[in-house]
Each structure stands twice: as structure tokens, then as C-alpha cells.
Amino acid sequence: KFIDKIGYTTYDALNEFALLESAVREDLNDRATRVSAVLNPVKLIITNYPEGQVEEMEAVNNPEHPEEGNHVIEFSRELWMERDDFMEDAPKKYFRMTPGQEVRLKNAYIVKCTGCKKNDAGEITEVYCEYDPDTKSGLPGANRKVKGTIHWVSCAHCLEAEVRLYDRLWKVENPRDELAAIREAKNCDALTAMKEMINPDSLNVLPCCYIEKYAAGMQPLSYLQFQRIGYFNVDKDSTPEKMVFNRTVGLKDVWGKINK
């Protein structure tokens, strides 16, 4: 797909990296299994949900191919959610978790945030909400309109994982052209100039993430879409005790926005 987009030529040509990422997204969107994973977790407690109760929710494997069916994801009183999906003092057009506002928990219920708990350093350690039992996915009440949907995993029914967030190696679009300019400006050798262009965030390892148990059956190099995050594959370093995932590409072109 990438070759089809850029065309065929016998001449040296520079193509935007975003074109390659776009082709990869298009390919993986068609064949990657969807799962929920929480990379920067904070605990979400549904205070009016019965303690000890567990429900099985259905999640679609791949909306591009309904014939691939669904899988089960457990729902319980205590969940992990993304820390970035909560804001205590949110701006007007913030549609995720904030006190007094409703959001939909994907494949589950609509909940209303009631507050949070902080530690002595002022860091949020728990988020609290109440659920509406009539809004379970598939019930008539689920049709109630809310503007935000967030993903989650059950604290008692998930796997611990390490996630390796690979990104672009270079900070510049064309390292070859930038190399000479940096060497001249800083009066340095080629190796030093190359180091100037390396993206310090080209690899970010997150050791304490959580993913739904369904991913345990995936073989090394299997592709997954972490919903709302990006496309990942199972690393060969994975073990039954702790899985390891590598990011192939995000859902959106972040670099394109930065450059604008």
C-alpha cells in the first residue's frame, strides 16, 4: 500500500514518513484485533456497584470484519482507567471523566464521576463514580447520549504488561540534508552531529501497564489495536506472567500536528 501511494521511480526521492505510517494504519486497521489496554493507570471505583459482582461483557474483535466475532471482557467494581482520561477541574469542552459529568465505559455502562482521592503529594490515586444499571450495552437505556467514551480493564481480571512505545528515530524529516548544516554550525564530526538529530523519546518503556486477559492467547508478532491508543504487536520477550508489547504506530499522526 505504501508503494502504491508513492508510486514507482528509478530516481532517488524523499517521501514523508507520514505516508508510510498512514499505509501501516490502513493495513493494521483491517487485520488487527481490538483490545483494551491501560498504559498510565489510575484506579476507578464504582461506588454503587455490588462488591464481589462480576459481569461478562462482549467486545468486538474487529469491526472491519464482523465475521471474526466477539470476545468476553470481565467488568467489576474496581477498574483501571487511563490517568489522562480524568481531570478534576476540566475546561468546558472536556468530555471525559470529571466530577459531575457522565461518560460511557466502552462495552459496559454509563457512569457519573463523583470525585477523587489524592495522596499527600497531591497526586490522584483513585477516581470515584456511580453507574446507571439501565445503561448496559445492549439495553434500551444505553441509547442515552453522552459525549465521551473511555476504555478500561477490570483490576481483578487483567494482565500486567510492559509496553514499549517506539517512535521516530530522528527529530528531523531529512537527516542527510541536516547533517552537513549541523556539522558546520557546531564544528563537530559526523557522529556528534547525528546524535544532535536523534529523538530522545524514540523509545519510552512503560513497565506497569494493564491489558485484558484475552490478549494472553496471542502469539509473538500478533497485531493488536489498543483501543484509542494505537497499533501494537506481541514481543517475543512476553511470558505468561508478564506480556510485552511494541508500538508499531499510533492511531493519529502526532508529528504532523507538532510540525504545524
Kindly label every feature range from the protein language model:
Residues 1-260:
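Polyanion-binding catalytic cores of nucleic-acid enzymes and NTP/SAM-utilizing transferases
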